[in-house]
Amino acid sequence: MNKLMLQDLHNNLKRRIISHGGKPIEVENGMSERFSHKQDTVIKSWLWDVPGFRRWRVTRMDAGDKLQVLNSVAYPAYTNDKPILGIDILWFGLKRKLVAVLDFQPLVQEERYFCRYYKDLQILKNRFVDFNSQKTMKIYDSNKYFSPWVLLYNGSFDDLQCSLAKILDEFLHAYWQVDNNNSREYIKIIPSKVEQLHINYDIYSAERDPAHGLFKSYFGQTWADQFVREFLFPHSHLTAD
């Protein structure tokens, strides 16, 4: 794996978004691109207007052989209570270490919600055994905004037996299929409650995002604070339920 391979993953994600009607929109307040003040590093971010979603963001960080990052979070419209899509891929080139986290991030931890939205992710979890890492994400409460079937790889890239590109492609396909998992017994969460759950998610994530320290080391604290609060989790300034 190298910089070009991670860029290919980004390009595949972009094609998927466009194929579902996505159109790029302007990233404001100087958040679209930032060069490191002390290292040969750049971070770029994009926003997409995608039918059925209120916000879809993508970020790429390029620090050469030291580090490559691809991150994306997609928030469905408030009228849809399906999970938030989360993608986090980090490649530490000098160590040849890969950390990849792919999940349908649940708005609530309830059995009926899991039955409604997680059948396809469960199938992927069973198929791709490499993504059953037992290493936990210590910063986060895994029972809060991660599903029981989060796809997690944390280890040497050389030990990965399956194609990361294939996993990401099937993961995205599965996410777009969740609306087809109809259940007559399932009663959707009302839009006003979904909005509050999105706010809670942003507040929780902004307070615990481990990437903040990374951004701070490369781009300085002032910009890192602004990036996390205004671009990554813009609802974090609102009031939690």
Swiss-Prot record:
Gene3D superfamilies for the chain: 3.40.1500.20
Keyword entries, A-Z: Oxidoreductase
Annotated catalysed reactions: 15,16-dihydrobiliverdin + oxidized 2[4Fe-4S]-[ferredoxin] = biliverdin IXalpha + reduced 2[4Fe-4S]-[ferredoxin] + 2 H(+)
BP terms from Gene Ontology: phytochromobilin biosynthetic process
GO molecular function: 15,16-dihydrobiliverdin:ferredoxin oxidoreductase activity; cobalt ion binding
Function: Catalyzes the two-electron reduction of biliverdin IX-alpha at the C15 methine bridge.
NCBIfam families cross-referenced by the UniProt entry: PRK13247.1 (NF009720)
HAMAP family referenced in this protein's UniProt entry, alphabetically: PebA
The protein's name: 15,16-dihydrobiliverdin:ferredoxin oxidoreductase
Lineage start: Bacteria, Bacillati, Cyanobacteriota, Cyanophyceae, Synechococcales
